[in-house]
Amino acid sequence: MKQDDLGIKDAADGLSNSQRQWLQIGGLPPECVDDGFYLDRDGLANEMTGWTYPYHLIDFETAAVALPFHKGRRPYEQVAFQFSHHVLESDGSVRHQDEFLLAEPGVFPNYAFVRALRAALIGDQGTVMRWSHHENSILNAIKTQLLEDAAPPDDMAALIDFIDSITKGGPRAMVDLADVARRRYFHPSTHGSNSIKKVLPSVLISSDFLKAAYGQPCYGSAKGGGIPSHNFTDMLWWRRTEEGVTDPYKLLLPVTANAETPAVNQGGAATNAYLCLQFEDMPDAHRLVTEKALLRYCELDTLAMVMILQAWQHWILQVN
């Protein structure tokens, strides 16, 4: 196949879809071969000038089921039961700042969820970042739920104002890092995917900074220079294998020692874990380890965003 066969078109800003397709088919341009990836350093650096520290990286876990668990809710209505929140400061320091999980059987979590998210983010005007459109869609769905509620909470207006401020079109609209990756970054190992589960291993294998930073047990370490974490202690994220580097999501252990119980290491498993938690007859010990697995998984999602940002930042600095 030749470039002409794809009808390649330039994008207004960054890579177009057809240009990404050609990188996947034709390989990296000569000037990118030594790096092993394509990064629009100038475009990314310019885009970053519009961001404000501290950076707030957030990720949600949600469910939408045919038979609602909560009284008065509709089939397939969005339920937001969990979020994770990392902060990246201008000096490069990182911390797992906040987390939220409400999986008590019969308790509709959405309003408490957005209330906790608001409390986590209103302390400054730092840029809020997500991966893909999911978080934006969920917040808008919660806004609709608030507006349609016959007996809304007393703080409905404040919650809606907050949602409007960080969703698309708002004065503090979230930055979609998946969209940034689509326009600015391509690594052959992702096979064209912009899933965070594909992008994270690609930056880990290529970034000397990440190797140095996470190739030692600093995450969740109480020692000087350690990265504060709610759910990990002395965690080593960068681990060499014969094939390259271990995918961090594969380091998340199964909920129980039962081989038939899968690890919570992707969104579908997180949703299933939440659904299991809605059954009141779940033993307390199993409930505890399931909730812990959910917390660890969601924390890794926002840490993954931090790592990707750090890799991009240091690749820009290497040139500039």
Language model features with spans:
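DEDD superfamily 3′-5′ metal-dependent exonuclease/proofreading module
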Residues: M1-N320
